[in-house]
């Protein structure tokens, strides 16, 4: 995890100090056939970066959803050229669909993968996730 960030929240005129851990979040381009969505929009990136998180988006990850790289950069994301780069730097990967075989080797032990998983139909995926 990256550095600790102090955030102040007000609730009924009471100020509370909460310690949270900022994360390094990666958004790879979806490589599953016919998947054109992206896991985070530029607006989502803005919300995360405002809260102290670092967001790395693979180049052209949002293009098929109508979001060019420049929109992500304008909201605080950093663009990386390859899927390997995104997986290598991120503590948490955010995806629309479950990882497919070429991605299995990219997932590191302890890395969080935030996506929809359907383990019942994918034995290889289940085994790969258990190993990571």
Segment roles from a protein language model:
Residues 20-131:
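Structural/interface elements that position substrates and couple domains in central-metabolism enzymes
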Residues 4-5, 19-20:
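Polybasic, lysine-rich low-complexity intrinsically disordered segments
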């Amino acid at each position: 995890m990256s550095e600790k960030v102090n955030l102040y929240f007000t609730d009924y005129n009471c100020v509370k100090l909460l310690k949270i851990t900022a994360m390094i979040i990666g958004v790879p381009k979806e490589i599953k056939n016919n998947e054109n969505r992206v896991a985070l929009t530029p607006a989502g990136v803005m919300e995360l970066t405002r809260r102290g998180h670092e967001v790395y988006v693979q180049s052209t990850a949002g293009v098929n959803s109508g979001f060019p790289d420049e929109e992500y950069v304008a909201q605080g994301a950093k663009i990386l050229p390859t899927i390997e780069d995104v997986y290598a730097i991120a503590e948490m990967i955010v995806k629309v669909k479950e990882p497919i075989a070429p991605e299995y080797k990219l997932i590191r032990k302890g890395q969080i993968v935030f996506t929809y998983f359907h383990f019942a139909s994918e034995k290889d995926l289940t085994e790969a996730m258990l190993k990571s």
